[in-house]
Amino acid sequence: MDKFKLENLGGGITAVISKEHGFGTDALLLADFAAVRENNRCCDMGSGCGIIPLLWLKKNMNRPVAAVEISEQGCEQMKKAAEVNSLGGRLEIFNEDLRRVREFLPAGEFDVVTMNPPYK
């Protein structure tokens, strides 16, 4: 895990971050602002290290959360975060290009969809 760093966020949540895929305050705010409920079906697009789905799942959501990320490294970080946080199969990771989203995620399947694209 040399290329990754574990970051304890408190509340039993540990994020797996790297130079390429980290997160900022905006991701924490978006995860909360989305106001997901226990039985919502949720998807985060362009998930990076998976911080938003991770925060949702640690709120004891009953349903799996989908995370779409084009970067293999980002998906690897999410897999490690799922292991570290004992999420079992509750994090569904799609290593895909969002331009093809209709090919792998059916329309109307989700109650909540978020996206926090990178910016400078």
Model-inferred region functions:
Residues 1-37:
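Class I SAM-dependent transferase core
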Residues 32-120:
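Conserved SAM/SAH cofactor-binding pocket of Class I
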